[in-house]
Amino acid sequence: MQKIVLATGNPGKVRELANLLADFGLDVVAQTELGVESAEETGLTFIENAILKARHAAQTTGLPAIADDSGLAVDALGGAPGIYSARYAGTDASDQENLEKLLVALQNVPDEKRGAQFHCVLVYMRHAEDPTPLVFHGQWPGVIAHQPAGAAGFGYDPIFYVPALGKTAAELTREEKHAVSHRGQALKLMLDALRDA
């Protein structure tokens, strides 16, 4: 089995990808298991940050790497919080603090202007000097609710309402969410590309 480093310390992401990539003969290992520190996210886009993370992990370990960068873009806020989604309320802010800051920012915004999209960019880098990393983008449209609902998921899921399903992302089962989410879409594109390779 070919070993590949996942540029994250998030055990949930590692587990999910490890199961899906095992069929392709890939053994997914979290960068934290290999003693790799997180890369500094200095890019201005999800794509730039995902490439920075993948390159850092590949450079440090000498292994192929997969990285993701994702976040929420709210129309009424010009795309914010965007690449700053995880630290919208400050560097060490909790999911709840980020969510509350977003609700305050949108408190006077009418329903028809509360459109938003979750974005996920997945990058597969064969080696640190890979001149053509594979880049996959998933986008999930929704609306920012006025109040949180649901206990599943994380981050902004409790206020990300999906009109087509009549629920927030935090009210969906893991299977329902994976079938329609930004990360699920990007992952499907990556798996299709690996299948065709």
UniProtKB/Swiss-Prot annotation:
Please share the entry's free-text remark on the cofactor. Binds 1 Mg(2+) ion per subunit.
What is the uppermost EC class here?
A: hydrolase
What is this enzyme's EC? 3.6.1.66
* Residues that bind substrate: T8, G9, N10, P11, G12, K13, S70, F154, G155, Y156, D157, K177, H182, R183
- InterPro entries reported for this sequence: dITP/XTP_pyrophosphatase, ITPase-like_fam, RdgB/HAM1
Catalytic activity annotation: XTP + H2O = XMP + diphosphate + H(+); dITP + H2O = dIMP + diphosphate + H(+); ITP + H2O = IMP + diphosphate + H(+)
Gene Ontology BP annotations: nucleoside triphosphate catabolic process; nucleotide metabolic process; purine nucleoside triphosphate catabolic process
Q: Which SUPFAM superfamilies match?
A: ITPase-like (SSF52972)
Catalytic residues (UniProt): D69 (proton acceptor)
Q: Where does Mg(2+) bind?
A: E40, D69
- Recorded GO MF terms: dITP diphosphatase activity; ITP diphosphatase activity; metal ion binding; nucleoside triphosphate diphosphatase activity; nucleotide binding; ribonucleoside triphosphate phosphatase activity; XTP diphosphatase activity
**Pfam families documented for this protein:** Ham1p_like (PF01725)
User: Which cofactors must be present for this protein to function?
Assistant: Mg(2+)
Segments spanning the bilayer are none
Keywords, comma-separated and alphabetical: Hydrolase, Magnesium, Metal-binding, Nucleotide metabolism, Nucleotide-binding
Annotated GO CC locations: cytoplasm; cytosol
Question: What HAMAP family does the database record attribute to this sequence?
Answer: Non_canon_purine_NTPase
Q: What does this protein do?
A: Pyrophosphatase that catalyzes the hydrolysis of nucleoside triphosphates to their monophosphate derivatives, with a high preference for the non-canonical purine nucleotides XTP (xanthosine triphosphate), dITP (deoxyinosine triphosphate) and ITP. Seems to function as a house-cleaning enzyme that removes non-canonical purine nucleotides from the nucleotide pool, thus preventing their incorporation into DNA/RNA and avoiding chromosomal lesions.
Question: How does this chain assemble?
Answer: Homodimer.
What PANTHER family has UniProt attached to this entry? INOSINE TRIPHOSPHATE PYROPHOSPHATASE (PTHR11067:SF9), INOSINE TRIPHOSPHATE PYROPHOSPHATASE/HAM1 PROTEIN (PTHR11067)
Family the UniProt entry places it in: Belongs to the HAM1 NTPase family.
- The protein in question is named dITP/XTP pyrophosphatase
